[in-house]
Amino acid sequence: MFHLTTALDAASGVPLYEQLYESLAAEMRSGAIPAGTRMPGKRRLAAELSVSVNTVDAAYQILATEGYMEPRERSGFYVQEYLALPTRPEEVPPPVSAAPPEAAEPPVRFDLSTRGVDPGLFPFRTWARLQKELLYSSPQLLTHGDAQGDMELRQALADYLEEYRGVRCTAEQVVVGAGMEYLLSLLAPLLPGKTAVENPGYQRAKQVLENNGVACCCLPVDADGLSVEALSGSGAAVCYVTPSHQFPTGVTMPAGRRTELLHWASRCPGQRYIIEDDYDSEFRFDTRPMPSLQGMAGADGPVVYLSTCSRSLAPGIRIAYMVLPRQLLPAWRAKYRIYSGTVSRFEQQTLARFIREGYFTRHLARERVAYKARRDALAASLRAAFAPDELTLTGLHTGLHLLARLKNAPPDAALRAAAKAQGVALSLLSDYDLTGGERDFSGTFVLGYGSLSEASFPEAGETLRKVCTAAREASVTV
């Protein structure tokens, strides 16, 4: 008689063959049915367990398929030799002490972070209509796409960039990807040597480059942008810059400094490159935006142009793009032609139509009006809440944030703590110091105005005043 340690239960809802398989497999793993054991014949075991032969056959087939047993011709099924496992006492892990409960953070009342955008400005109806039309008319979009991105979108981007940013390129030079971080990760192995980054600057870009094995050096930013003098003495072969709207200072690099930067790169053709992150160039409120560095350099110049739809449309769209110099295209294709595209083809084709049919430029025009009104409201609220000589505002002409420098400011740590206590999400200029304190960036708020409504700014300004007062009081008592 063959005995199972676990009885089969016809009323359990689990098929009998699965129950039999699980029971036999467990006994084989534990060694209760030793390796080398000849298993009972199907009819005999079926009779002993009062089940059908089909039930036993199904369980045996699964056990054989998974290697628990092997069938031998005219001899039956045998338990595999390697299945018997040594038994050992179960190790009971030491108890883990409960973590102390964290104090609840005050809710955010005013989001003045630099990454904020207003989802209410997204063109929902137009975007949904275009996607619906594509869904029914273009089933081929469910298939694999080009690693560089769909040609229709690349052509639409090339045309748009030439007209509005002065970028000189063909669709062949455009690469579409799911975010700036992804594109930087692809770009990093193609470029030579050390990369210079701006300080204060974009920590995420520096981190992505370093994650991909690129050594970075941090160079100072002055009133005209990245110091080319410092760059020339740095030994860097690549520089990463945000010339249209330096992040986070808001400086726009003038034509003279741009020319100096291009001369630096052109002195060593093929050995020096500029990564131009065209951050916030769409949002220049009071004057026309300057043409891109890439446009000044030309299609064969040493500039890689980067941009994204995260600000102009929405972060969740996850569409970014770069324009490669023609001389880098062979290396890019050799390395990445086997990759799959990272952006939904439906999203790509929707954006292509959105651009081609004129919706994108009209959408940007509406956004500029809305964000300019918010910039004005934030600036007015700050001027009303603070004395004229107490706060200096800069970086107002472009982008979705401004800088507010305090006179006789309390320590930044006190300002951060007071802002958190008041429910204000914001940044300080020192948060973007990439060198760990080599320069003094203290006492300056970096205030985004993309998330809040105009009506919220008067109270937000008064709350910032309270933040400064509380921070001063806290720093005096320490």
What are these regions (language model features)?
Residues M1-K132, P139-L142, Q327-L328, R333, ...:
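N-terminal basic, amphipathic alpha-helical segments
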Residues R74, M296-A331:
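Active-site PLP attachment segment
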Residues L112, I274-I275:
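Residue-level marker for buried hydrophobic side chains located in beta-strands
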Residues A215, Y273, V424-A425:
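Residue-level detector of anion-binding/catalytic polar loops
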Residues Q131, Q140-G270, E282, D286-A299, ...:
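Conserved core of the PLP fold type I
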